[in-house]
Structure formats: C-alpha cells, structure tokens
Amino acid sequence: MKISLVIVAYKNGNILLDCLNSIEKYNDLKDELEVIVVDNSPVNERVESFVKQSSIQNIQYIPSDNKGFGAGNNVGAKVSQGEVIGFVNPDIVLIEPIFKQIYSDFKKNSNLAIEGIRLLKKNLSPGYSFYFEYNTKVWRNWTIKLWNKLGWFNEKNMFITGANLFVRKDMFMNVDMFDENIFMYFEESDVASRIKNKYPHAEVKFNKGLKMIHLEGGCTDTSKERIKMSWDSMIYYGKKNHLNYKKKVRFEYGYYKFKKCIFSLISQSKKKEYTE
C-alpha cells in the first residue's frame, strides 16, 4: 500500500460523503490507496451509513470514542498499511489527482517527513494551508493570508495545517504519533516538532502545485468551547516545548480583544470578508 488516508469524522455525514466521492473520482493510485474513516461522532449520530454509500474499494470504518482529533487520527494510523499516511479533514474536496505526485515526492526524497498542499476555499480563492509557529507578532497575523496566497512557506517558522497533512509513516510512528493530551489544535505543529527533533535531516514541504478545496476556509468559529480548546492546547504545547506560553496568552488575549473591537465597528459583510 502506498498511501493511507485517515479521516476523523464528527457528525455531518453528507460532507464526509462528498469528500469520499471526490477521493474516489481523483484516485490516481487505484488499489494502492486506502481510506480509513474514524468516527468520533456520538453513537446516535454515527456516519457509518454514509461511508457505506461510498464506492471506494479499500475503505475501513472504525467507530471510536471522541478523545480528540489527534487521538482519532492515531486510531487510524495504527491500522494503516501505507508507506505514507495522509491525515485529511472530512470537509476537504479533491478537484484534481494528487496522490501519485505526493507519493513520488516521498520516494524521491528519503528525508521528506511531511508534505502539505494548497488549500482553496469553496470559491477557489486561496485558503489557509499553513500558519506561523506559536506566533506572538501582530504583523504575522495580518500577513499570513498573503503568505498563503503567494505560497511562501518557510519550514523554519511555519507548520502545515492538519486539514491535509501527509507524513512518512515510519517517522510518524517512531515519535509515538500525535500527542493525545492535545484534544484539538497544535497537534500538527507538535508532531512536526518531534519529528524534526528526532530526525535532524527531516524536511517539511509545501507543494503549491497541488490543490484541494477546504470547505471550512478561514477559521471563523469563535464559540467559547472551541476558543477554550484552542487556549488549553496552546498553553499545554507551550509548556511542553519550553516556549513562553505566558507571552503567547497575553498576545492572543490582546489580539482577541482587538478583533472584537474591530468587529463591533464594521458591517456583517465586512466581518465575513475580514475573517476569510
């Protein structure tokens, strides 16, 4: 098996089915690609019926307790057979063949540990494929959209988002996979950091020549629960990696208050444009 795709689903089976149908349509590895769906949904909202509607030949469905995004991905990784594991969100939609090229990139470069591709919004405008690592600078927050638009990825201070994270399986398993103490957010930068620490020559690549749609687009969900998850992960990750998490908390709090102030002064249409 060349590539194993692991998809952690949480409710919303229709979106998952669109994802699976696009994978089937643009599968250029045929039976050398497998798909593993890990279902973190509540028992009464499982997505198994949608998975059964897919015509993908090599597909596994695994119901799981919701212990977090990283933990769900680990469930899939443990049963995967591929040399490369692709962790993708259920709200991605393929618009072209990508797997043969990604696999070729890993085969050609034995130091390649992680690869991501360009994420587009539903209207095909540039989305967010990568972010700055543990950022505490306002200018980076304001310019990250431009960096993504131009495809300017710097592996020294950026990380590929977990919406499309392709990793070399042996390296991933040798650093004990995702940290399951992180429920959501920062798990991709954490595993990238551990891989680079264990493998000094490991490389992270952003392939801007390949693309897929990410329906979520910009991070517009500001619910209190998700904000708390993000902050809990941010503090845990900072402590774990001996970063100045107190400075990070002050920065994020100040930036959050600033955005709330700006949002109170602009129209709803401008708010949508701003968050995208």
Give the role of each language-model region:
Residues 64-80:
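Glycine-rich, basic loop-to-helix element that forms the pyrophosphate-binding segment
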Residues 223-276:
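Non-catalytic, C-terminal membrane-associated alpha-helical segments of glycosyltransferases
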Residues 97-129:
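Conserved donor NDP-sugar-binding/catalytic core segment of glycosyltransferases
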Residues 134-157:
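Short, flexible, basic/aromatic active-site loop/helix in glycosyltransferases
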Residues 20-63:
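Acidic donor-binding segment of Leloir-type glycosyltransferases
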Residues 85:
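Short aromatic/hydrophobic "clamp" motif used to bind/position activated sugar donors
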Residues 192, 200-224, 234-237:
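Active-site donor/metal-binding and catalytic loop motifs
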Residues 158-177, 181-210:
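A short, conserved alpha-helix in the catalytic core of glycosyltransferases
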